[in-house]
Curated annotation (Swiss-Prot):
Cofactor comment text: Binds 1 zinc ion.
Annotated localization: Cytoplasm
Annotated SUPFAM superfamilies: Metalloproteases ('zincins'), catalytic domain
Top-level taxon: Bacteria
One MF annotation (Gene Ontology) recorded for this entry: metalloendopeptidase activity
Name of the protein described by the UniProt record: Endoribonuclease YbeY
Originating gene: ybeY
Keywords annotated in UniProt: Cytoplasm, Endonuclease, Hydrolase, Metal-binding, Nuclease, Ribosome biogenesis, rRNA processing, Zinc
Record's GO cellular component terms: cytoplasm
Names of the cofactor(s): Zn(2+)
Length: 155
């Protein structure tokens, strides 16, 4: 059975902002690893940020001077110890909450989707090419269905 250790960084987020409890993040990632049949000890950092910080990161690492919902930074160090460090998932709290409201989705559903989306990027899935996007979206649908959430791509 896989295990995932989470370093959940929420220090820079005001107390009155809405975001999921760490146990929910843990549940979503555990489910994803089970569906993906990954059987190793892993570690991931989940960092929650505001629009300014996500915009800076998006500009620096993707050349896009605009906010985005989630960024993933895979760890490229080949470290021998366990758990294996996968990398960082950076989530923009305001963006994710605004998207959920605009798309008329439950907050928990959209947060689960964005968290799983970020994890899949750390595991080397991508959506640049249409074929890759279909594979990634199908995995997201499967994992979210296991968690009891509807298809995130249906209106």
């Amino acid at each position: 059975m896989s295990t995932i250790v989470i370093d959940y960084q929420t220090e820079s987020i005001p107390d009155d902002w809405l975001y999921p409890a760490e146990w929910r993040i843990q549940r979503w990632l555990d489910c994803a690893l089970t569906v993906l049949a990954i059987d190793e000890a892993l570690e991931v950092t989940i960092r929650l940020v505001d629009n300014d910080e996500i915009t800076e990161l998006n500009a620096e690492y993707r050349g896009k001077n605009a906010p985005t919902n989630v960024l993933s930074f895979p760890c490229d160090w080949d470290l021998p110890e366990e758990p294996r460090l996968l990398g960082d998932i950076v989530i923009a709290v305001q963006i994710v909450n605004q998207e959920a409201k605009a798309q008329k989705k439950k907050m928990e559903q959209h947060w689960a989707h964005m968290t799983i989306h970020g994890l899949l990027h750390l595991l080397d899935y991508d959506h640049i090419e249409e074929k890759e996007a279909q594979i990634m979206e199908d995995l997201e649908r499967t994992i979210l269905a296991q968690l009891g959430f509807p298809d995130p791509y249906c209106a």
